[in-house]
């Protein structure tokens, strides 16, 4: 088995601090926080502290936060929950596949939806929306890391923060937002839905009680996510420097490479396409050299292969490699990776 010396894949192991919290929770067990016994009251207090920790990190009020047992369902809750009869839905051609799914479902129900195009930098085109229309606006793209230089103009805004997490909070007003626990190295299966405009939102799922979202989340996972978040925020972050080095190295040392990522985008994502090289072969060569990377679309939908994001940006999809810069990636790892990349590309082009 090849020894991986630097892992640039998007998937990441659970943060050690969160793992310790999770083991403690499973060993201790947990009660129903809605009951009145001592253990339940203690857990309810702990959950409130967790909620306050999330609120502080996300710059929102504790009562605006809802925990989800699956982050993907947050797209339907956050988007469809804002739609009213007659509302139009706007989203972009570089949004996540879950957004496309919600838009398709709404269109099938007779709603007017508009998919906004983007330019070669991934900047969403201008639009005209009424105050009651809903606009999906991603803070940063999950493949390229590119940001939107402009704030959404009008409408009710759903902020997709699943890629950006706490690395970059929205700098615009929004009504609902969705965060994914894995973006701060927390456990999968935890989403954070922020509902700022409670008077303009309603639960779009079938329900017969007053709860805003399904209470199907795992309490130990939510608590572990909070622990991971605190640890993540306390760690040093040199990823902007590392991203700059990678982009400048590729630009100057390897010919015929199209870099989709802007240097001033979200620091943790780099996407580039190497001409005259098959991505899968390059991925395996890099793996043999000790470097794990991703290739193709970050979406999991078979309908969006190999990359609807690059296609929308009119970027080449052949030879595409994606890097995720995690906080434990060192400067030396990046230097070694760049040299290995140059060598692997030269080898494949020669053959």
Identify what each model region corresponds to.
Residues 1-351:
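Pyridoxal 5′-phosphate
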